[in-house]
Amino acid sequence: LAYEYAPEKRKGFFGSIPQAGVTIGMLMATFIVSLMTLFDEAQFLAWGWRIPFLLSSVLVFLGLWIRKDIDETPAFKQVKKSGQVAKAPLRDTLKHHWREVLIAAGLKVVETAPFYIFSTFVVSYATTTLSYQKSQALESVTLGALVATVMIPLMGLLSDKVGRQKMYTLSVVLLGLFIVPWFLLLDTGTGWGIMLATIVAFGILWAPVTAVLGTLCSEIFSANVRYTGITLGYQLGAALAGGTAPLIATGLLAKYDGDWRPVAVYLGVTVAISLLAIFCASRMKSAPDVASSRAARA
């Protein structure tokens, strides 16, 4: 929706705004948890635990209100007017656009696996394998999320000038190059080490990847199957490399006696998969279905 409603020269910026929802959610959750520390244990167990759920209900109603007043996008209305709406979008997407789905999934891999490594796995790794205090790890992740929240729309805006594919490719390469330094910084055992590692990896290098991902995937699919195609690609990539990432990383640490190098190799594989995906996406640039949809949007 953000992509299709956006002006032609601002699609990267508008497409990046929803992507910031993840880090904004992390910051909101951190704030709520911080408020809960104002209660003693008895108060929290008696009634305090209900407060986060009550506050989240406000977001539910806000989402329903927004959804209620959203109309179909101009691009989809044009498809509908021309009679090209897919009667069975899931079937048509899997039959005619399965390559695009795989590419979208591949693009998602390096966005989702490092996210969970840099924001979730790092807390466990820093406090169990290394000698950090839990507060140090959580503070570094919170600061990384804050930096990412600022960086995401800025990178989306920049992508409108330099191009989505160039920004994605450069960001993924830099992310891959920083994998080993990330572990080395953590191994210093210092507060500045974990803070710098998390801010650079999560806040600076991961941010442009997620900033352009939504717009990049939107440009792969034609308007009549765009929603279905992106959803399939996103969910497939997230299922393969999302929530499983901390489990795989923890399993590798356990198997290799705390050696971080196998985890670094695993992250390197996610980088390679997404670089292959962006290469394939660039080769599909002039595909008839994509080209025609772009012409229709022009």
Language-model segments: what does each one mean?
Residues R10-T37, T231-A245:
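Glycine-rich segments within core transmembrane alpha-helices of 12-TM secondary carriers
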